[in-house]
Amino acid sequence: MSRYHDELWALVPGDRGPAPRHLLDFVRGLPPARRALDLGGGDGRLGTELAADELTVADVSAAALERAHGRLPGAHLVQLEPDAPLPFPDSHFDLVLCANVLEHVHDVQLFLSEVRRVLEPRGTLAVTTPAHGRLTGLDVLARGFERRFDPLSPQLRFLTRRSLARLLDAMGFEVVSLSRRAGAVLAVARR
């Protein structure tokens, strides 16, 4: 599975510039952390914006983590096994960022239960995901189901504000804020 993700990262330009403004603003607005986890952090583009004393960037792609090392030489880098428990102790982080990750995860219940486990009580979970809603339905009508929901696409899940809120609530998180900006759903929740 890691090979698949490494092949995807090979298609991403090495210097793709800064992250989109709405994501930068969202991450910069998160509370400072003692220990932060950028889960699915890829090349570390957003991890550079986290105010944390200690930063861990974890991803399934070794190629992405090599890029993250160049951006974040002081961060702990951890390669993950897909759909496996996270290799961190219970209640280890006070902030977990999952930026554009949930839509790619096979077992979202395992993933979020593991996030909850490694997050300390009252710790912060920050989630971003592409927004889907009525416009997605119109796009399906206009362009066709198969084209919109390509079975070879790395995207497995299509979330709306409401479905993300329900998912986080069902997994034991308290949603603190939920917004939609520039085609993204942005959520902050507490354990």
What is the predicted function of each stretch?
Residues 100-104:
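A short His-aromatic
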